[in-house]
Regions:
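Terminal substrate-recognition subdomain of acyl/acetyltransferases
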Residues: 1-3, 160-174
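A short beta-loop-alpha structural element at the N-terminal edge
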Residues: 8-22, 172
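Acetyl-CoA-dependent GNAT
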Residues: 14, 28, 40-99, 110-111, ...
């Protein structure tokens, strides 16, 4: 995809905070597949800048941006704990603007995350939670080697309060 439409993948830096917040606000309007609360969406850019600085300097955290024509159209993150006993586990999250769904961007970003994790040699488990009804995402994760470990009944809710089942999925790095 990157050759076809000129997508740039790069790590986020503190100066990206405002654009990331705009993009995440748009994604939150477009889909109920993500679980974002008001606090995350109303985060002051300065606070996110500090968080982005920490992530950028960290060896076991990553925020990858997909940029097209100067606009952030997707993010892929890996968040790991600083505590030694959990520092080998990275929680994966991917968000893509709806206009760019189905174009291979999720695959591209997930390949980059897995490659980064293997190269860093610090993370030995990637994990994520995904709504069972998000078939497109489940297909992507399975295609990339993630395994379903559990079904969490009532693991999430819709805006109308309907309970949703959620998969716990993982990818083990040898």
């Amino acid at each position: 995809m990157s050759e076809e439409v000129g997508i740039i993948l790069r790590e986020a830096v503190p100066g990206d905070a405002k654009d990331i917040l705009l993009m995440m606000g748009q994604v939150n309007k477009e889909t109920e597949f993500l679980v974002l609360d008001e606090a995350e969406l109303l985060l002051p850019p300065e606070t996110l800048e500090e968080e982005l600085d920490y992530i950028y300097e960290s060896n076991n955290n990553l925020l990858l941006l997909a940029i097209y024509e100067g606009t952030i159209i997707g993010t892929a993150s890996v968040k790991a704990d600083s505590q030694f006993r959990l520092s080998h586990v990275g929680e994966v999250g991917i968000s893509i603007l709806q206009e760019y769904w189905g174009m291979g961007l999720g695959t591209l970003m997930l390949e980059e995350i897995i490659s980064w994790a293997k190269e860093m040699g610090i993370l030995f488990r990637l994990e994520l939670d995904v709504q069972v009804r998000n078939e497109r995402a489940v297909h992507l994760y399975r295609k990339m080697g993630f395994q379903i470990e559990a079904v969490m009944p009532r693991g999430a809710r819709t805006d109308l309060g309907e309970f949703l089942d959620v998969y716990k999925m993982s990818y083990l790095i040898e």
